[in-house]
Structure formats: structure tokens, C-alpha cells
UniProtKB/Swiss-Prot annotation:
InterPro entries hit by this protein: DNA-binding_RecF, DNA-binding_RecF_CS, P-loop_NTPase, RecF/RecN/SMC_N, RecF_2
Name under which the protein is recorded: DNA replication and repair protein RecF
GO molecular function: ATP binding; single-stranded DNA binding
Gene (name only): recF
Organism field: Streptococcus equi subsp. zooepidemicus (strain MGCS10565)
Pfam family of the protein (one): SMC_N
Classification lineage: Bacteria, Bacillati, Bacillota, Bacilli, Lactobacillales
């Protein structure tokens, strides 16, 4: 798939903007604070209905306006698709081919993206919530049913925690009813995550070995808060562990086990990547991002769109070359933001170059090798 055009109204610093893209490489160039990342963020938001930079939709609306819209035309293997998101103080509306989508799981997945931004370099050493978010975003695009299971799980978890905080004496029978619902959805979430991480680890290691010239092996371990050896055991193990922590949960007023406590651990040559060098971290994240691209292609049969937000300047020449080689091999539509082409000496010549300046975007040139 590839996005053919994007239209913004009252989005960030764009009062009105439109751009048509090539199915290959698209580069946004401009000084800092002109709107390059905002434009890339809009593509990302149109896909996953969330920003990678803010939790508040209000931050996305142009100064002194009450609403904004993002719309785009997507070319998929199955045909052309029109996507639109409307944001206002009343909430948000998502549309596919002008039809409102009642649930996020009905919308997300229509356009798949993989984002590589500077903050992704914190994925290994950052909080576990970052790694859970990483799994959620990928799985949500690949498997819509995952979002449904996760949404139901979070709803029951909120109910359970609210109950624990509100009572002075535990009603085990009532808690068991909540446990049953929590385990039903939670075990599905963990099963999805386990299968995803196992597949992702294989792809990531392939890319990492290519980047390291065969010197390093990358492995990823899914650290579920529920102990189990086989996928078939997840439901029963989760139920058993939840029952044994009733008193603990009552005293602490929260739920101590479940997928909301999951984590990932990365290893390079068997050593925890927390202790890896800065260069190794960059190689690891680069491998992970290209593995996301490969896996989405494998599991859905269509290409995701790759968004590279000012990351080329974070990579040395060798890693830049490896990244661009991988992009060329995967043959996916790619967007790159940069302040200068000097960081992009390894770029192929067949690119569409857009100049971004003070909330305007214009095609500067199409260079063909």
C-alpha cells in the first residue's frame, strides 16, 4: 500500500495543506520548527489515530481553531481507499470511504505504518510501558481483533481496580466474576503478544546480523507477568495466579498480574541490551524497525508505509547505508524528514523532494536516477 495524497485543515501549524506523493521515496526538507515532523505525524495519526508526540488531541488543532481534519487517499492491493479523521472539542470521528467507523478496531489497520523517530532510541532502556505500547501499535494494525481484546481487557481491569479501591472488605465471589472476564480477554492479549514477539524476533535477528556483518545475534524475550511454558497454559496459569494474589491486590488496591505488567527484554549475543553501546542500541532499533516492515508484509500480504522522522542524522554512514539498502529491498513507500541533504548522501536519486516552510509544503523536485 501507499498513500497517494494527504490533506490537512487546521492541523498543528498547517492552516491548509495538501501534497501528492510518489509510491517510492519522499523527502521533507526544511529548517527546524517549520512543520516537517507535523506532516509526518499527520500521516501516522491517520493510520493509528494517535500521535507519537502528545497524548492530547487539542495539541493537534491549529491555534484559535476548534477543530481539524486529516484526510488521505490510499492505494491498496484491494483498491483505492479514502481515510479521514475529524478532531474537535466534542471528540473524534474516523471514516473509511466516507463511512463513520464505530470502533477503532474497525478503522485501524486500513493503513499500516512503521514509524522510526528519535524517541524510539529509548525503547530498550525506557519504561516497560513504552515496550507495551510498541507491541500494541504493531499488533493493532496487523490484527484488528487484538485491539478489541485489549480494549475489553482494559475496561475490566479498570472495573476491578475501582472495586479494590472502593471496598473495606473483600467479596471474593464478586471478585471472581471480574477475574473470569479479566482472564478471558487477558489470556487472548498475551497469546497474541507471544506469537508476535516470536515472529518479530526471527525477522529482527536477520536484519541485525546483516547490519553487524554477522558479528551479533539479536534475541527478544517476551516477559509476561504470568508464568507459563506453553501458549495453551496461559488461561489457567493467569487464573491461578490471579486467585493467589487476591489479598495482595486488596491491600495494594490494584491488580498485580496481567498483560498490563508485561515487558520485553532485548539481548545482543546473549547479553542484556541495557548494557550495550550507543552504536549497538542504534543497530538494534534499526533492526527492529525493518523487522516490523518485513513482518507486516508477511502477515497481511500488503506493504506498510515507513516513516523516518529525523533519524538519518542519528545514524552513522554505515547504518544509513544499511537502512537505505533495507528500504530498497523491502520496496515500501518511505517518508524522510531532514534539515539538510548532507545527512542523506546515500539517498538514491529517484526521490520526490518537498520543501517545508512555515506551515506550507511544496514539491521542490522529482529526481530520477
Amino acid at each position: 500500500m501507499w498513500i497517494k495524497e494527504l490533506n490537512l485543515t487546521h492541523y498543528r501549524n498547517y492552516q491548509q495543506a495538501s501534497a501528492a506523493f510518489s509510491p517510492g521515496l519522499n523527502v521533507f526538507i526544511g529548517d527546524n520548527a517549520q512543520g516537517k515532523t507535523n506532516f509526518l505525524e499527520a500521516i501516522y495519526f491517520l493510520s493509528v489515530t494517535r500521535s507519537h508526540r502528545t497524548k492530547s488531541d487539542k495539541d493537534l488543532i491549529y491555534f484559535d481553531e476548534r477543530d481539524c481534519s486529516i484526510s488521505g487517499t490510499l492505494e491498496r492491493l484491494s483498491g483505492r481507499v479514502q481515510l479521514e479523521i475529524l478532531l474537535s472539542d466534542k471528540g473524534r470521528i474516523t471514516k473509511i470511504n466516507t463511512l463513520k467507523q464505530a470502533k477503532l478496531s474497525d478503522y485501524i489497520g486500513a493503513m499500516m505504518v512503521v514509524l522510526f523517530a528519535p524517541e524510539d532510541l529509548q525503547l530498550v532502556k525506557g519504561s516497560p510501558s513504552l515496550r507495551r505500547k510498541f507491541m500494541d501499535i504493531d499488533l493493532g494494525q496487523i490484527k484488528p481483533v487484538y485491539l478489541s481484546d485489549l480494549s475489553h481487557y482494559n475496561h475490566v481491569l479498570k472495573q476491578r481496580n475501582a472495586y479494590l479501591k472502593s471496598v473495606h472488605q473483600l467479596d471474593s465471589d464478586f471478585l471472581s466474576v471480574l477475574d473470569e472476564q479479566l482472564v478471558t480477554y487477558g489470556s487472548r492479549v498475551m497469546a497474541h503478544r507471544l506469537a508476535f514477539v516470536q515472529s518479530l524476533a526471527k525477522e529482527a535477528n536477520k536484519h541485525h546480523q546483516a547490519i553487524s556483518n554477522g558479528l551479533e545475534k539479536l534475541s527478544i524475550s517476551y516477559q509476561a507477568s504470568v508464568s507459563f511454558e506453553h501458549q495453551q497454559e496461559i488461561y489457567q496459569q493467569f487464573m491461578d495466579q490471579l486467585k493467589t494474589t487476591h489479598q495482595r491486590d486488596f491491600l495494594r488496591k490494584n491488580t498485580g498480574v496481567g498483560p498490563h505488567r508485561d515487558d520485553l527484554i532485548f539481548y545482543i549475543n546473549g547479553m542484556n541490551a541495557n548494557f550495550a553501546s550507543q552504536g549497538q542500541h542504534r543497530s538494534l532499533i534499526l533492526s527492529l524497525k525493518m523487522a516490523e516492515v518485513s513482518l507486516m508484509k508477511q502477515l497481511t500480504g500488503d506493504n506498510p508505509i515507513l516513516l523516518l522522522d529525523d533519524v538519518m542524522s542519528e545514524l552513522d554512514n554505515i547504518r544509513q547505508t544499511k537502512l537505505l539498502e533495507a528500504v530498497k529491498k523491502e520496496n515500501v513507500q518511505t517518508f524522510i524528514t531532514t534539515t539538510s541533504l548532507k545527512h542523506l548522501s546515500q539517498l538514491p536519486k529517484d526521490i520526490s523532494l518537498f520543501k517545508v516552510n512555515k506551515g506550507t509544503i511544496a514539491l521542490d523536485s522529482v529526481m530520477i536516477d
